Regions:
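Glycine-rich, mobile lid/loop segments that gate access to catalytic sites or pores
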Residues: 1-76, 204-208, 212-216
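Structural signal for hydrophobic packing residues in well-ordered secondary-structure cores
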Residues: 1-9, 59-66, 128, 132, ...
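Solvent-exposed alpha-helices and their adjacent loops that cap or buttress functional pockets
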Residues: 11-15, 32-35, 82-85, 131, ...
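Short beta-strand elements
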Residues: 19-46, 79-98, 141, 153-160
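Intrinsically disordered, low-complexity acidic/polar segments
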Residues: 30, 51, 74, 100, ...
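Hydrophobic transmembrane alpha-helix bundles
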Residues: 45-62, 95-109, 166-190, 216-219
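Glycine-rich anion/phosphate-binding loop at the beta-strand->alpha-helix junction
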Residues: 50-129
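Internal helix-turn-beta structural module
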Residues: 134-136, 142-219
């Protein structure tokens, strides 16, 4: 959709376009393996001079099949969402599939662990999976105001690791310095990188983000 707007394939498209993909998974000893895409829904912000019928026809032909369930969508962004705070934190991260601490990212600088610790948690989880220590991992970090080190570290691998949670936590402690200032330095969070987080979420879609590049672990 974004490419079609930029290259003129669908010139009436506007930036605030949302997609929802429903996927069927199977459980495989704690890991989840995608089987098929069940439904794809596209809600596209558009110019005023295109009808819903024309919009549906063009997107069906040029993009995908199941689109625009709510009809017209001319006004988008914060103007269309009164009370919008810090962007939508679930769709920005794991879409309800993983856990979220509840703090928004956008609008906060990198010194806030709502943002920096969420990024390093992603980095840790990807590094564990990349190292073959698990096929699936949830990493939970707990911080307190004025305390540099996390109060607790928890890992759930859903039965996909041959190591205990305590053993994995020890590996994490030996490979990652989780003080906020160090997180900022190691992930280059003080650089002008945040423009790209304003679209398509913070996790998974843009592999150039530092937290998407697994660290080589020593264990």
């Amino acid at each position: 959709m974004s490419a079609a707007r930029r290259d003129g394939t669908l010139p009436w498209l506007r930036p605030d376009t949302k997609t929802q993909v429903t996927i069927e998974y199977k459980h495989d000893n704690g890991a989840v393996v995608p089987l098929r895409v069940d439904t794809i829904v596209v809600s596209a912000q558009h110019a005023e001079d295109i009808t819903t019928e024309q919009l549906r026809k063009e997107i069906k032909e040029k993009i995908i099949k199941k689109i625009q369930p709510s009809g017209l969508f001319i006004i988008g962004g914060p103007q269309g969402d009164a009370g919008l705070t810090g962007r939508k934190i679930i769709v920005d991260t794991y879409g309800g599939w993983g856990a979220h601490g509840g703090g928004a990212f956008s609008g906060k600088d990198f010194s806030k662990v709502d943002r920096s610790a969420a990024y390093v948690g992603r980095w840790i989880a990807k590094s564990l999976v990349n190292a073959g220590l698990a096929r699936r991992a949830l990493v939970q970090l707990s911080y307190a105001i004025g305390v540099a080190e996390p109060l607790s570290i928890y890992v759930d691998t859903y039965g996909t690791s041959d190591k205990t949670s305590d053993q994995l936590v020890e590996i994490i402690r030996n490979n990652f310095d989780l003080r906020p200032g160090v997180i900022v330095r190691e992930l280059n969070l003080d650089r002008p990188i945040y423009l790209q987080t304003a679209k398509n979420g913070h996790f998974g879609t843009n592999q150039s983000f530092t937290w998407e590049q697994p660290k080589t672990l020593k264990f």
